[in-house]
């Protein structure tokens, strides 16, 4: 939601969209391509076109980023470096997607682009917002009084 994973992937895959690549090549080859690019793949990931607008709105609430790493340790390092370089002082928790729900609590909000993560978060007692765009997420946050 902050970074443009698709743009980075398409650059690494000579223009093939992530969903198409994974469908045609399989999940293992998908992650091999990404992880083969090393830590730079993650550190160099560009902002989403509306990512800074979204961040500017939420930063006053001192959000904690909850992000899923890839299979490789390089993604963990790369994501930490990206946050350090772009959002200094922001806390980052790395957790597999299936484990994100373990961080849910009544007053915690998960903003995520995967419906399954939102569903699990809500089932665990948290507030979930399915991120489609910065404008839509900001609208939903305002509806919550933020």
What are the functions of these language-model segments?
Residues 1-35, 123:
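Active-site neighborhood of HAD-like aspartate-dependent phosphohydrolases
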Residues 101-105, 140-146:
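Short amphipathic alpha-helix with an adjacent loop that forms part of the alpha/beta core around
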Residues 109-143:
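Acidic, Mg2+-coordinating phosphoryl-transfer loop and its flanking beta/alpha structural elements
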Residues 66-109, 115-118:
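Substrate-recognition "cap/lid" segment bordering the active-site pocket of phosphatases
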């Amino acid at each position: 939601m902050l970074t443009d994973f698709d743009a980075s992937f398409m650059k690494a895959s000579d223009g093939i969209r992530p969903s198409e690549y994974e469908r045609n090549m399989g999940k293992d080859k998908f992650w091999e391509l990404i992880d083969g690019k090393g830590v730079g793949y993650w550190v160099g990931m560009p902002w989403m076109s509306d990512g800074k607008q979204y961040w500017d709105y939420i930063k006053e609430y001192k959000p904690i980023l909850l992000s899923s790493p890839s299979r490789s340790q390089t993604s963990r390092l790369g994501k930490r470096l990206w946050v350090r370089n772009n959002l200094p002082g922001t806390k980052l928790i790395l957790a597999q997607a299936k484990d994100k729900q373990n961080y849910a609590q009544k007053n915690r909000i998960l903003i995520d682009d995967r419906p399954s993560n939102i569903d699990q978060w809500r089932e665990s007692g948290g507030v979930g917002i399915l991120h489609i765009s910065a404008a839509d997420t900001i609208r939903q946050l305002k509806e919550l009084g933020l």
